[in-house]
């Protein structure tokens, strides 16, 4: 078992990845900014602390998810995020 450190967007997003009971998971923090992420596998993102404003491919509107709320993203897709305050998240690869 190991912990994988990741840094994206010039350090604006940092995560720690690990495997738990055969499922890949990461936890991390996003600094204020706008980001676009691509997915390979389906994902479930849960906001741990803060808020994420999300727009998934095919959606016209932005949706805000706050602490304790989750959203799913399809595999082989992408989603845009607006982060107004530093926000902690959990990402589960489904």
Curated annotation (Swiss-Prot):
Reaction equation(s) it catalyzes: a purine D-ribonucleoside + phosphate = a purine nucleobase + alpha-D-ribose 1-phosphate; adenosine + phosphate = alpha-D-ribose 1-phosphate + adenine; cytidine + phosphate = cytosine + alpha-D-ribose 1-phosphate; guanosine + phosphate = alpha-D-ribose 1-phosphate + guanine
Organism domain of life: Bacteria
Pfam families: Ppnp
HAMAP family named in the record: Nucleos_phosphorylase_PpnP
Family: Belongs to the nucleoside phosphorylase PpnP family.
Entry function: Catalyzes the phosphorolysis of diverse nucleosides, yielding D-ribose 1-phosphate and the respective free bases. Can use uridine, adenosine, guanosine, cytidine, thymidine, inosine and xanthosine as substrates. Also catalyzes the reverse reactions.
Name of the protein in its database record: Pyrimidine/purine nucleoside phosphorylase
Protein encoded by which gene: ppnP
């Amino acid at each position: 078992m190991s912990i994988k450190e990741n840094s994206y967007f010039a350090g604006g997003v940092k995560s720690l990845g690990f495997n738990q009971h055969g499922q890949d998971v990461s936890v991390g923090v996003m600094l204020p900014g706008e980001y676009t992420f691509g997915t390979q596998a389906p994902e479930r993102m849960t906001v741990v602390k803060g808020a994420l404003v999300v727009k998934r491919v095919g959606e016209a509107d932005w949706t805000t998810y706050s602490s304790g709320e989750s959203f799913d993203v399809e595999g082989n897709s992408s989603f845009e995020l607006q982060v107004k305050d530093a926000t902690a998240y959990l990402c589960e690869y489904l």
